[in-house]
Swiss-Prot record:
Monomer. It holds the Pfam family ADK. The keyword Iron does not apply. NCBIfam families: adk, PRK00279.1-1, PRK00279.1-2, PRK00279.1-3. Pathway: Purine metabolism; AMP biosynthesis via salvage pathway; AMP from ADP: step 1/1. GO terms for biological process: AMP salvage. This is Adenylate kinase.
Amino acid sequence: MRIMLLGAPGAGKGTQAQFIMEKYGIPQISTGDMLRAAVKAGTPLGLEAKKVMDAGQLVSDELIIGLVKERVAQDDCAKGFLLDGFPRTIPQADAMAAGGIAIDHVVEIDVPDEEIVKRMGGRRVHPGSGRVYHIVFNQPKVEGKDDVTGEDLAIRPDDEEATVRKRLDIYHEQTKPLVEYYGAVAAKGEATYNKFDGTQSVAKVSEEIVAALS
């Protein structure tokens, strides 16, 4: 069960990733975690990646694909894996296919931009404890104040509307070609491609994912 997860920031991808991992007993492969682990383990590819990152440069697709191949060959990936946030571009998707890393299912969680802006723009955080509130979905007892300390709540820079919209623009720009790419792969019968409505309840989305993957 080799799954690739697509979804904009704030679409609820992390929650479904956790669910898929537990349900199918497969690990999540995130390129950031993988890079850090390879650097820490001091593997030849990890050392190469460290050299590039220490120089303040971007790690090449070739190197990332090498790390992914190394990672999926590990024992815990015997039943499959969940790729999150990779590939991001068509060259990466091509390199993955050329490297023999096949995908069985593409799962896209779709939430309209305005809904994401509402979700993320409504988040408030208590800087001291990291407690998170939401002006619509999880309101503090007193508006703008932390329930425990009564201190002021803040908006994280990442949650400001302009930042959220910019991240969404980048996501759509990067992902639209990938959606078409994997749509074509699915049309050839080499994988399944399913799009889920992420505005539904978490449980409903999970239920639909299981139905589509079984």
